[in-house]
UniProtKB/Swiss-Prot annotation:
Annotated glycan sites: N153, N206
Catalytic activity, reaction form: H2O(in) = H2O(out)
Name this protein carries in UniProt: Aquaporin-4
Residues anchoring lipid (S-palmitoyl cysteine): C13, C17
Motif NPA 2: positions: 213-215
UniProt function note: Forms a water-specific channel. Plays an important role in brain water homeostasis and in glymphatic solute transport. Required for a normal rate of water exchange across the blood brain interface. Required for normal levels of cerebrospinal fluid influx into the brain cortex and parenchyma along paravascular spaces that surround penetrating arteries, and for normal drainage of interstitial fluid along paravenous drainage pathways. Thereby, it is required for normal clearance of solutes from the brain interstitial fluid, including soluble beta-amyloid peptides derived from APP.
Species assigned in the record: Dipodomys merriami (Merriam's kangaroo rat)
Intramembrane segments: 94-101, 209-222
Residue intervals annotated with topology Cytoplasmic: 1-36, 90-93, 102-115, 177-184, 253-324
Residue positions where Phosphothreonine is found in the record: T289
Positions of region (Disordered): 305-324
Length: 324
């Protein structure tokens, strides 16, 4: 006899089921529209990083540095993202931010498979955009290439909280501006998002560099090899984005149909936890009665005529008392 274990009869079926699950998860990935969207995210991030990081270059160099113009930097970042959203929003949704993409996954607006490609394209675009800026900028003034760093007088925890807050306000603005259920939004959605980015920069440039976008921090970090506290610019924005998306989508402005389906699901779950009851015959006595026994749990013998409850035995055979 062979020592080789016998193959399970459902082995092929299980393998087939797994393949089908993968195909369902990646449904829509192998389409022309999908790859256009991924390319749009890549190109939008490349242009955004190239233009916005260019505003952080100090052309005075290390010897004669010019004063940092926070208004210039804030407006450049805000107007750049607004322009990219206006240009590519109808193609890919205009995420241009891994934190926004994660928030969209958590609110079931895009699939996990799609988000993986989006985030990869965003990070690649950020690297290439930062690389192009590095190549076209004189070495004497390139400086840190806009790498985001936490202020020296702040701890990593402070930086994390600041990034969480400014990303929260950005993503909440995105969800509120793009809500298809609203009829009162008459202005430019792209401009509203751009203003939100600008506000975040005006507040937080001196604190953390005001990233709000993991890919924006990832690109220059790769080019310059500076990874100090880099994790803050992933964890903070993603937590802030998920909180903002979840609060808007499920608390402040929930979808009526989604709310109804959630309520039905919770109702069914509650009914299942109560247990199922069935009418059975009482074989403990030779006297014919109209007693009703309820199972599972303690066995209750209820006299229907008198409306009171007699002592019964639980399934283990011990006398049981039920209090109401």
């Amino acid at each position: 006899m062979s020592d080789r274990p016998a193959a399970r009869p459902w082995g092929k079926c299980g393998s087939l089921c797994r393949r089908e699950e993968i195909m369902v998860a990646f449904k829509g990935v192998w389409t022309q529209a999908f790859w256009k969207a991924v390319t749009a995210e890549f190109l939008a991030m490349l242009i955004f990083v190239l233009l916005s990081l260019g505003s952080t270059i100090n052309w005075g160099g290390k010897e004669n540095p010019l004063p940092v113009d926070m208004v210039l930097i804030s407006l450049c970042f805000g107007l750049s993202i607004a322009t990219m959203v206006q240009c590519f929003g109808h193609i890919s949704g205009g995420h241009i931010n891994p934190a926004v993409t994660v928030a969209m996954v958590c609110t079931r607006k895009i699939s996990i498979a799609k988000s993986v490609f989006y985030i990869a394209a965003q990070c690649l675009g950020a690297i290439i955009g930062a690389g192009i800026l590095y190549l076209v900028t004189p070495p004497s003034v390139v400086g840190g290439l806009g790498v985001t760093t936490v202020h020296g007088n702040l701890t990593a925890g402070h930086g994390l909280l600041v990034e969480l807050i400014i990303t929260f306000q950005l993503v909440f603005t995105i969800f509120a501006s793009c809500d298809s259920k609203r009829t009162d939004v008459t202005g430019s959605i792209a401009l509203a998002i751009g203003f939100s980015v600008a506000i975040g920069h005006l507040f937080a440039i001196n604190y953390t560099g005001a990233s709000m976008n993991p890919a924006r921090s990832f690109g220059p970090a790769v080019i310059m090899g500076n990874w100090e506290n880099h994790w803050i610019y992933w964890v903070g924005p993603i937590i802030g984005a998920v909180l903002a998306g979840g609060l808007y989508e499920y608390v402040f402005c929930p979808d009526v149909e989604l709310k109804r389906r959630f309520k039905e699901a919770f109702s069914k779950a509650a009914q299942q936890t109560k247990g199922s009851y069935m009418e059975v015959e009482d074989n403990r006595s030779q006297v014919e009665t109209e007693d009703l026994i309820l199972k599972p749990g303690l066995v209750h013998v209820i006299d229907i005529d008198r409306g009171d409850e007699k002592k019964g035995k639980d399934p283990s055979g011990e006398i049981a008392q039920t209090q109401h």
